[in-house]
Design a protein with these regions (language model features):
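Extracellular beta-strand solenoid repeats
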Residues: 55, 66, 75, 84, ...
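Extracellular beta-strand/beta-solenoid scaffold signature
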Residues: 88-107, 123-130, 146-155, 169-190, ...
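Secretory targeting and sorting signals
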Residues: 1-29
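Leucine-rich solenoid repeat scaffolds
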Residues: 307-353
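Right-handed parallel beta-helix/beta-spiral solenoid domain characteristic of secreted/periplasmic
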Residues: 30, 34-39, 71-124
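Acidic Gly/Asp/Thr-rich repetitive segments characteristic of extracellular carbohydrate-active
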Residues: 31-60
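Parallel beta-helix/beta-solenoid
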Residues: 49, 69-70, 78, 111, ...
């Protein structure tokens, strides 16, 4: 049997502490399905009901896991629980797509309340975690590293919480949130989604928010990427914007990434706004991001690849030092962008510090 079901009341979740997760919150579940090394996480998920927890003990699990059950929690044992690609290609749709964990709903019925916690996902050709058509998704204490494209990818989703994760050495973004991962269209209202407390390093770009609205990115650390944070929009409507980028540490994102069909070379980019509106960048510490790309510098405003301008954005009360070619760079022709109260030395054009 792939898992053992333990019927229990919520109060008995103290048993989680016995497997080294004393700091985890109480299990809000009707049942716990325990998965040990050599067993299948997917089999446990397939047996689970809404409200259940799949508790995965230490070990390496060579599989992809597809979740369609609402209000399900998958909880590992920290970095000792590792999900890697299956030895034999194929399997479910998640495996066929090159993903580690998929949380998949539909446009008519988003899958709600799924939590993924305290595990590592590594080595997949595309994304460690791929979420589509979800509501109130929670991903926390996850290590997503050495994946071909994104560490954590969330599209067509509302009210997600991505917190206290580590995303390292992924081929594209460490954390990616978008209206669509492929395709265009107007910006999605994320309904106050949150990306917070994450450590994002050695990716192409640390955090990408593409064609979304009403998202907060705060208290994250981005270092060693080609670029720290990219907020991306275009001329489509609704326009991307109404984001808050605050209280982040964006340090020495000086890895070199070659140009592609949409973007020039990326190196030394701290926080980049391209084609967005009414976004606030405040109280961040942005230091030592240096390069010679048009996107290089501490905080950079740059037109979108389709020419869509930035407009109505506020850059205030940031510490931006030792960035190059400038700490603050306004390379846009959009209207209503303001720079106030920033601690910096060099701006382009002059007068922004």
């Amino acid at each position: 049997m792939a898992a053992r079901r333990f019927h229990q009341l919520v109060g008995t979740a103290v048993g989680v502490a016995a497997v080294g997760l004393a700091a985890a919150p109480p299990v809000q579940a009707e049942s716990v399905l325990l998965v040990s090394k050599g067993q299948s996480i997917q089999e446990a998920v397939d047996r689970a009901k809404p409200g259940d927890t799949v508790l995965v003990l230490p070990g390496t699990y060579q599989e992809s896991v597809r979740v369609t059950v609402p209000h399900l929690t998958i909880r590992g044992s920290g970095d000792r629980t590792v999900i890697t690609p299956p030895a034999v290609p194929g399997g479910n749709a998640c495996a066929a797509g090159g993903y580690g964990i998929c949380v998949t709903g539909t446009a008519d019925q988003p899958v709600a309340g799924v939590s993924i916690e305290s595990l590592a996902v590594s080595g997949f050709t595309k994304h460690a975690i791929n979420a589509s058509d979800t509501d109130r998704l929670s991903v926390r204490f996850v290590l997503a590293q050495d994946n071909g494209q994104y560490g954590i990818s969330v599209e067509k989703s509302t009210r997600a919480r991505l917190s206290m994760n580590r995303a390292r050495n992924n081929g594209q973004a460490g954390i990616f949130m978008a209206n669509l991962t492929s395709g265009e269209g107007g910006a999605l209202d994320t309904e106050s989604a949150m990306i917070s407390g994450n450590d994002v390093s050695a990716n192409r770009i640390g955090v990408v928010a593409r064609r979304v609205r009403n998202l907060t990115v705060e208290n994250n650390t981005m270092t060693g990427n080609c670029g720290g944070v990219f907020v991306v929009g275009d001329e489509g409507t609704p326009r991307a914007g109404a984001l808050s980028i605050r209280l982040n540490k964006v340090v020495a994102n000086n890895k070199f990434c070659p140009a592609n069909s949409r973007l020039p070379v990326i190196q030394g980019s701290g926080i980049v706004l391209t084609g967005v509106e009414n976004t606030t960048v405040e109280l961040n510490r942005i230091t030592d991001n240096v390069g010679t790309s048009p996107l290089s510098g501490g905080v950079v405003l740059f037109p979108s690849f389709t020419g869509g301008p930035n407009s109505g954005n506020t850059v205030k009360d940031n510490t931006a030092l030792r960035n190059g070619p400038a700490d603050l760079s306004d390379r846009d022709t959009g209207l209503g962008n303001t720079f106030n109260g920033n601690h910096c030395l060099v701006s382009a054009p002059a007068g922004r510090c």
